[in-house]
Curated annotation (Swiss-Prot):
Name of the gene this protein is made from: ureC
Protein name: Urease subunit alpha
Record-linked NCBIfam families: PRK13206.1, PRK13207.1, urease_alph
Amino acids binding Ni(2+) 2: 224, 253, 279
Post-translation changes: Carboxylation allows a single lysine to coordinate two nickel ions.
Pathway where this protein functions: Nitrogen metabolism; urea degradation; CO(2) and NH(3) from urea (urease route): step 1/1
Amino acid sequence: MARLSRERYAQLYGPTTGDRIRLADTNLLVEVTEDRCGGPGLAGDEAVFGGGKVLRESMGQGRASRADGAPDTVITGAVIIDYWGIIKADIGIRDGRIVGIGKAGNPDIMTGVHRDLVVGPSTEIISGNRRIVTAGTVDCHVHLICPQIIVEALAAGTTTIIGGGTGPAEGTKATTVTPGEWHLARMLESLDGWPVNFALLGKGNTVNPDALWEQLRGGASGFKLHEDWGSTPAAIDTCLAVADVAGVQVALHSDTLNETGFVEDTIGAIAGRSIHAYHTEGAGGGHAPDIITVAAQPNVLPSSTNPTRPHTVNTLDEHLDMLMVCHHLNPRIPEDLAFAESRIRPSTIAAEDVLHDMGAISMIGSDSQAMGRVGEVVLRTWQTAHVMKARRGALEGDPSGSQAADNNRVRRYIAKYTICPAIAHGMDHLIGSVEVGKLADLVLWEPAFFGVRPHVVLKGGAIAWAAMGDANASIPTPQPVLPRPMFGAAAATAAATSVHFVAPQSIDARLADRLAVNRGLAPVADVRAVGKTDLPLNDALPSIEVDPDTFTVRIDGQVWQPQPAAELPMTQRYFLF
């Protein structure tokens, strides 16, 4: 019996078990560990759509109606890259959720068809063959300064935004906060028509618990403590006390100037309670020079923002101007200039690289328009992974040499912007991974453009954004091919396929009856018991020390010397600027 060669099989159906794929132009390779579509042994039985192909009536398409359980959409033959593994499978979507990961087709004539992936007349097909599928990005640090950032986020594969703001107000440009019931209501209403899940953070800087509770009833999903509003030990303690009762998360930007205490005082005020530490390295703010040491605390859930990812020869130069603008500083005032300069330290930025590679810093967000770029979360993450592989070699468990594959490193890094922030903020029951039962917030990538620009972005099972050519052309592919909104981005559809994450107290207060919103309000899960060990593949707790005079960083006793990268992948090969 004739058999297909592996090369020919890959040309027809995409990679299979044992094949390796390079991610964009990085040094990262992933190996497919399982093929649930069949593989060369069942060649010809794969679910493939097209003229003369498998998914036709009484062939790969069966008789099952939607009422019989047929999925609304099947993504065929995709390589799934997620924190739990790297496999090839067909993915079934129904009612906006993932219902099956396995083999699709017609069980009347095909073997091994998953019971929830029976293709019928009601089923649409998206080809994932020779493409990669990931979960949509969960950006855990977004300043809602202007609505245009949502366009940029979607075009980069972001499907969930955690943050706050009211527009280009000085408070929003600095602090990621939507303060008070009125602002929360107006922002929840204004965001209703975008095909993105939103979770707004209320202002946590107060010693008045009543002011915190009213924000939870008004639609906040949690709180943000920011030094520009005064992150005092008393405010930290009060906010966490309310959060412990409410079950919500608190994000912290601590006191850079050490006016109300040092990092040890903040750790004392936190008192072992779960907290999300924003820009843990410190360039984005926090106790100078040693806020990075909180990454060694088991109750602290540490994240980075993307402008310091990875450390390059240009990182320091661009940060000073960013700081002056974002924090409303005056370069003619010496104290303001000193404040800005105290936050930019090559040694801690370099240490941030290796702490990510070890899994000691667990998440990456954007800090959009406030010292970060909303469209570069994914790109900066993989640039960091590339730089670390070049400097540190293969991670433990990853083969090197001619059989090199970076599955462990890739799974660690993808978790930083998908499942880890979802767990930290109580959303992982709905989002954060490619798993059955979750919203079909999925991103398809061409391997050559992985992490650079998505091929298709699905929001709740509907195609919301895609790389699309000239609309007046005779076929969809003629240039210019640009990321463009699709039908799933229409306001009514977006509301039907997206949610606002809110505190459970707002559900109890019947917030939906008081808002002009069409989307569902989804209560966040209780996160008060979430610690670093709950963040998959990113739970390392090394010893971290910072010399207060030289800013030298020791990780498990070893000095990590800055070696800023002079060249990166995913840059001028893809972008003009």
